Structure formats: structure tokens, C-alpha cells
């Protein structure tokens, strides 16, 4: 890959997107993944794994704010948070903004991701790797949740698409393990693709999660980087009330948190659970 070259995403066979490349900062094929970071004049630094864009400097805040602040503020008193994946450090960055959180454990299958993101995506982690509450575990996510004796208040699965190394993080074995190691009142969330184009992912996740959680749904956010625009996040807990908090409660918790966000706010939080009819029909549920 050379300067000014065009990089094509390969997630979809019949359509997709491209990025002009100003400079390739890093590329290495590790045991688990083909990693590349390059600079784009509009989106800043772009990270891709196995031909699929994972994050860009320009809009990563949308994804990471919604993946963290929605479950943490819905919980209200989270002390221990588990992040599966998230090697770029941005999920850790957002979780660490919650002063009430006492321990943040991140399980990443590939140590190489963490090391090169420290160097090449410094704005993503913003020094969060040095937070004394942070503990890094290099392990497979499925193995960890099924072997650990620890319990967590919130689990965030910052997984790749269900192909390659990320496939196991969409299985019943993983969801069962997550349900097992959540404290009472705990919440599980996971990225679930762009449902307009990857609807089967949401349907499969809904079916599998429903085996272990009483309340399973999804929420959404508009993230330009991901082709199709509207990213879907899986939500699972044993208490439907956590998903149905009134706006006044969310506003109070947000104010108390001291957070200053660029995308998330209490109204976005409440509205994000309103799902399009085509997804409700596919899930065979009513709202």
C-alpha cells in the first residue's frame, strides 16, 4: 500500500466503501489478525482488521460513548466493569470517566492490538491504559467468562464482526458465560453490526441471548464510518426496568456523573431503544 492509494473495505461482497490513504502508519499480520492503520484526510487515523474498518478518529466517540454510558448510567451504581476486546483503548477511556467505577478489566485476545494502538491511536486511549483501576488480561473472551470466578456489574463486548476471531463472541457459550459472571442487576451490551445490512446477526443474537437473559433488546446510534450508517447494539439483563428508565432519572444520573459528551445525552439514551419496524418484525417482537 502506497501513499494516495485507495483502500477498499471487503466486509460485503457486492457493495462497500473506500478510503483514500495519505500515509500508512502501521501494518502487520499477527497470529490472529491482519492489522493496518492509515491516515485519511477527512476521518483522520483509520484502523482496519482483516479488511474491515474498525474505528476512525473522526467519529469513534459516538460508538464508544454509546457502548459505555448507556449501560453504566442505566445501572447507576456499577463498580466492576468487564470489557471484552476494546484493544484500541477508547472503551476503557470512556468507562474510566465514571468515577464510581472501582475496577476495569479488559480481556483482549491479541496483545499486538494493545501495543500498536498505544503508539498509533493515542487519542483513542488518551492515557487510560495508565488508570490504576485498569487490569489487562490476554485471553480468549469465551474462555475468560466461562472460567473466571469474578462477578461484574456491566459487561461490554467490543467485538469485531462474527467472522474470524470475533465469531466466538456471538455464540451461546459466550452469552451463557456472560450471564453467569454478572452480578444481580448487571447489564450486558455488545456491538451487533448495521442491522439493515446484517439483520441475521441481530436475529441470532436475540435468539441466543434470550436463553440466558429475561430482557433482551437492542439500541442504536448513527455512526458514519460503518457502511449503512445505523449501528445496532445488543442489550441484555434480567430486569426490564433497567432499559425503561424515565428521562428524569437519566438526566439526574447524567448530571451527577459530571460527564461532558459529544454524542450521548439522556434524550439520546432514551430514544436509542426505539427500533425500526423492520427489525421488530424480524425479531418477531412488538413494542
Curated annotation (Swiss-Prot):
Source species taxonomy: Bacteria, Pseudomonadati, Pseudomonadota, Gammaproteobacteria, Enterobacterales
EC number: 2.5.1.16
Catalytic residues (positions): 158
Positions of S-methyl-5'-thioadenosine binding: 33, 108, 140-141, 165
UniProt cross-references to Gene3D superfamilies, sorted A to Z: Spermidine synthase, tetramerisation domain, Vaccinia Virus protein VP39
Name of a matching Pfam family: Spermine_synt_N
Origin: domain of life: Bacteria
The protein, known as: Polyamine aminopropyltransferase
Catalytic activity entry: S-adenosyl 3-(methylsulfanyl)propylamine + putrescine = S-methyl-5'-thioadenosine + spermidine + H(+)
Molecular-function GO terms, alphabetical: spermidine synthase activity
Organism for this UniProt entry: Serratia proteamaculans (strain 568)
InterPro entries registered for this protein in UniProt: PABS (IPR030374), PABS_CS (IPR030373), SAM-dependent_MTases_sf (IPR029063), Spermi_synthase (IPR001045), Spermidine_synt_N (IPR035246), Spermidine_synt_N_sf (IPR037163)
A GO CC term assigned to this protein in UniProt: cytosol
Family: Belongs to the spermidine/spermine synthase family.
A GO BP entry: spermidine biosynthetic process
Domain PABS: 5-238
Metabolic or biological pathway: Amine and polyamine biosynthesis; spermidine biosynthesis; spermidine from putrescine: step 1/1
Self-association and partners: Homodimer or homotetramer.
Keyword vocabulary terms for this entry: Cytoplasm, Polyamine biosynthesis, Spermidine biosynthesis, Transferase
Function text: Catalyzes the irreversible transfer of a propylamine group from the amino donor S-adenosylmethioninamine (decarboxy-AdoMet) to putrescine (1,4-diaminobutane) to yield spermidine.
Amino-acid positions noted as binding spermidine in the UniProt annotation, renumbered to this chain: 64, 88, 158-161
Amino acid at each position: 500500500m502506497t501513499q494516495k492509494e485507495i483502500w477498499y473495505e471487503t466486509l460485503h461482497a457486492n457493495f462497500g466503501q473506500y478510503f483514500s490513504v495519505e500515509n500508512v502508519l502501521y501494518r502487520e499480520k499477527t497470529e490472529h489478525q491482519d492489522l493496518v492503520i492509515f491516515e485519511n484526510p477527512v476521518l483522520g487515523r483509520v484502523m482496519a482488521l482483516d479488511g474491515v474498518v474498525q474505528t476512525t478518529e473522526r467519529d469513534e466517540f459516538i460508538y464508544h460513548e454509546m457502548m459505555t454510558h448507556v449501560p453504566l448510567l442505566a445501572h447507576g451504581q456499577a463498580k466492576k466493569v468487564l470489557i471484552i476486546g476494546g484493544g484500541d483503548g477508547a472503551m476503557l477511556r470512556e468507562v474510566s470517566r465514571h468515577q464510581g467505577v472501582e475496577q476495569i478489566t479488559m480481556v483482549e485476545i491479541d496483545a499486538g492490538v494493545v501495543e500498536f494502538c498505544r503508539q498509533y491511536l493515542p487519542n483513542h486511549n488518551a492515557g487510560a491504559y495508565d488508570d490504576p483501576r485498569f487490569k489487562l488480561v490476554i485471553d480468549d473472551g469465551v474462555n475468560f467468562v466461562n472460567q473466571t470466578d469474578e462477578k461484574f456489574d456491566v459487561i461490554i463486548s467490543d467485538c469485531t464482526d462474527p467472522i474470524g476471531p470475533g465469531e466466538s463472541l456471538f455464540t451461546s457459550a459466550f452469552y451463557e458465560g456472560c450471564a453467569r459472571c454478572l452480578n444481580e442487576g448487571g447489564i450486558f451490551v455488545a456491538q451487533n453490526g448495521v442491522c439493515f445490512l446484517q439483520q441475521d446477526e441481530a436475529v441470532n443474537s436475540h435468539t441466543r441471548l434470550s436463553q440466558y437473559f429475561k430482557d433482551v433488546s437492542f439500541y442504536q446510534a448513527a455512526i458514519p464510518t460503518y457502511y449503512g450508517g445505523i449501528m445496532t447494539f445488543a442489550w441484555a439483563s434480567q430486569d426490564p426496568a433497567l432499559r425503561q428508565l424515565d428521562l428524569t432519572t437519566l438526566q439526574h444520573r447524567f448530571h451527577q456523573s459530571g460527564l461532558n459528551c459529544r454524542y450521548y445525552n439522556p434524550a439520546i439514551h432514551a430514544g436509542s431503544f426505539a427500533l425500526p419496524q423492520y427489525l421488530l418484525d424480524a425479531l418477531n417482537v412488538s413494542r
